[in-house]
């Protein structure tokens, strides 16, 4: 469950669903580390707030209106970080998701595990890795949380980022069907 191992040198020796996306869209970028973006930071904070809220204090947040301000540039030390008003919006999303009885039940109730890494052979002798956001053993489901700026475009996002192959790989790694909860 160590992020350093999963995302570091050890983890890079195995294929992941992200690799499928890169190979399909830009094979020359295969193996190149992903650049942080505000959207990735937002999604990461949302996941942490839902799945590992005790780790939120490790995430740097700057109280500035934009990333172009002097305050932000001085405090960020050249690293992309979240702005306080972005965190405020994420907290509303967290509250909204957990206010939904069905979603909350799937995420919080019963025999559930969070941030579960998996490793195994999916295609012949090729090892694949995946990290399940939530495994609900009572419902026999893998639950993946997705944030989106536009729910109407989710079907295109699912195609672009190959949610179908993610579900296939995770089903093989963890043995349960996968559902996506998007907000």
What are these regions (language model features)?
Residues 116-183:
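Mg2+/Mn2+-dependent nuclease catalytic core
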Residues 1-131:
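Metal-dependent nuclease catalytic cores that hydrolyze phosphodiester bonds in DNA/RNA
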């Amino acid at each position: 469950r160590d992020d350093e191992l999963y995302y570091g040198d050890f983890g890079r020796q195995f294929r992941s669903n992200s690799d499928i996306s890169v190979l399909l869209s830009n094979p020359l970028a295969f193996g190149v580390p992903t650049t942080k973006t505000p959207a990735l930071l937002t999604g990461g904070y949302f996941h942490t707030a839902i799945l590992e809220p005790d780790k939120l204090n490790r995430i740097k947040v700057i109280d500035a209106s934009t990333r172009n301000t002097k305050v932000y540039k001085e405090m960020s030390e050249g690293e992309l970080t979240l702005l306080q008003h972005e965190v405020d919006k994420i907290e509303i999303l967290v509250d909204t998701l957990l206010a939904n009885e069905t979603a909350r039940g799937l995420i919080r109730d019963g025999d559930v595990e969070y941030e579960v890494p998996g490793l195994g052979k999916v295609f012949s002798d090729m090892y694949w890795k995946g990290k399940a956001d939530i495994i609900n053993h009572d419902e026999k489901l893998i639950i993946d949380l997705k944030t989106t700026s536009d729910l109407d475009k989710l079907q295109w996002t699912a195609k672009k980022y190959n949610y179908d192959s993610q579900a296939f790989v995770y089903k093989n790694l963890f043995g349960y069907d996968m559902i996506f909860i998007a907000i």
